[in-house]
């Protein structure tokens, strides 16, 4: 056991040697999938005396936490000569209350579930938009019992129920990904290449947050869609992750009078589902590494009837946003049901119905097309845990209540 521990200390200490670029490693070619990430972390992570990087070697808890601390807390992490090489990282992470769920041996491989828990705590309060804000979160119409229901909870990955909150946050922040079979493998360790990829994404987001005031929203092809604030306005732009290079300015929204800057920033987008991105600056479709705008006005929810007909919920943010008890904490509520035919240069936009300002239930949140009929859901919160939802048929310029309204 002593020999094993000594070997662990020797190998791990190599992480803290003089930095070199990825091009100098004998076993990391410029075609390696993690080449750019390893090179990006040349100041934080190093190789071995024989000139190798060993990208497939497993990373221990102490190694991962040391690299994490150097990136997340560069002004606090400090290696003291004569002390164990991992001690400063553990002290810094403990001071920031990041190690509550990390209790295993320092020399053992750090599992992905623990990495997710670490990143969840560190990223708490960051203002990105969850990828899960999609159709899976809509109210479900229960026609038989004539009521609206919350959707059945679906985990982001098939095997991560124990870490669902940690995995959701770290994945939605673009830091961790799952496997093609839908699993996350929370008990699996990470290799040096995988650790470099995870921590390179973290470092790049920290740089964009600090230098440009950006918040990660989602990934579009090879780029990151970021939110940024600028002189009372909030915008969207695509950035190249590791270089921070601006690729495409997507949209700009100026906060209406009376809407706080934080609220405007937090709610710039309503959702992203892997194909579309939507919110205050409109509706966009992912197309390779770019976003193509379909609707220029605010979009809270949408559905396609066919290839040329789009229905969506919109609102006028120059008016007072419906302020039922719960909505201010989540998404704004739409006030108009819209139809867009022939999206593109010859698009025809029609207002199908508008919210009845006297009805507290008509805070529109979801839109549906079933068997050729258009419906919209509205909700109202009477208090904590007391949420009511109603279903309306959109017909003849009106919202006709079918059930749930009181």
Protein language model regions, located:
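Bacterial N-terminal signal peptides
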Residues: 9-18
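Repeated scaffold domains used in trafficking and secretory/extracellular systems
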Residues: 212-219, 257-270, 297-307, 360-370, ...
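N-terminal propeptides
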Residues: 18-215
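Short glycine/acidic-enriched loop and turn motifs that connect beta-strands
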Residues: 229-233, 282-284, 316-321, 330-331, ...
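Surface-exposed loop/turn elements that mediate protein-protein interactions on large endomembrane-trafficking
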Residues: 235-254, 282-296, 324-354, 388-406
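Residue position within the beta-strands of beta-propeller blades
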Residues: 226, 277, 312, 376-378
């Amino acid at each position: 056991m002593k020999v094993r521990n000594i070997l662990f200390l020797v190998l791990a200490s190599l992480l803290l040697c003089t930095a070199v670029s990825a091009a100098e490693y004998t076993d990391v070619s410029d075609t390696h999938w993690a080449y750019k990430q390893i090179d990006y972390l040349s100041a934080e992570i190093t190789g071995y005396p024989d000139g190798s990087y060993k990208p497939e070697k497993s990373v221990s808890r102490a190694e991962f936490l040391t690299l994490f601390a150097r990136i997340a807390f560069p002004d606090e992490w400090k290696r003291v000569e004569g002390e164990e090489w991992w001690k400063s990282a553990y002290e810094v992470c403990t001071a920031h209350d990041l190690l509550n769920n990390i209790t295993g041996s320092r020399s053992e491989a750090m599992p992905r579930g623990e990495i997710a828990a670490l990143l969840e705590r560190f990223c708490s309060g960051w203002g990105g938009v969850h990828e899960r804000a999609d159709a899976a979160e809509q109210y479900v119409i229960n026609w038989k019992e004539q009521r609206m229901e919350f959707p059945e909870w679906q985990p982001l990955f098939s095997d991560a129920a124990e870490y669902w909150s940690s995995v959701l946050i770290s994945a939605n922040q673009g830091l961790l990904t799952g496997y093609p079979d839908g699993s996350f493998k929370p008990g699996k360790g990470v290799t040096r290449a995988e650790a470099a990829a995870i921590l390179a994404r973290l470092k790049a987001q920290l740089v964009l947050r600090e230098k440009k005031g950006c918040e990660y929203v989602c990934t579009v092809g090879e780029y990151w869609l970021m939110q940024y604030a600028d002189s009372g306005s909030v915008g969207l732009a695509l950035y190249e992750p590791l270089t921070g290079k601006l690729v495409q300015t997507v949209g700009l929204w100026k906060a209406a009078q009376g809407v706080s800057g934080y609220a405007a920033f937090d709610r710039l987008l309503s959702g992203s589902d892997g194909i579309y991105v939507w919110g205050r600056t409109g509706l966009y479709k992912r197309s390779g590494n770019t976003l193509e705008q379909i609707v220029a006005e605010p979009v809270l929810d949408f559905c396609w009837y066919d290839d040329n007909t789009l229905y969506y919920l919109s609102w006028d943010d120059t008016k007072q946003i419906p302020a039922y008890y719960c909505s201010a904490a989540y998404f704004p509520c739409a006030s108009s049901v819209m139809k867009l035919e022939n999206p593109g240069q010859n698009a025809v936009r029609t207002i199908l119905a508008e919210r009845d300002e006297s009805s507290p239930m008509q805070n529109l949140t979801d839109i549906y097309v079933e068997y050729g009929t258009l419906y919209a859901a509205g909700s109202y919160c009477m208090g904590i845990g007391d949420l009511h939802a109603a279903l309306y048929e959109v017909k003849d310029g009106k919202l006709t209540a079918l059930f749930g309204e009181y």
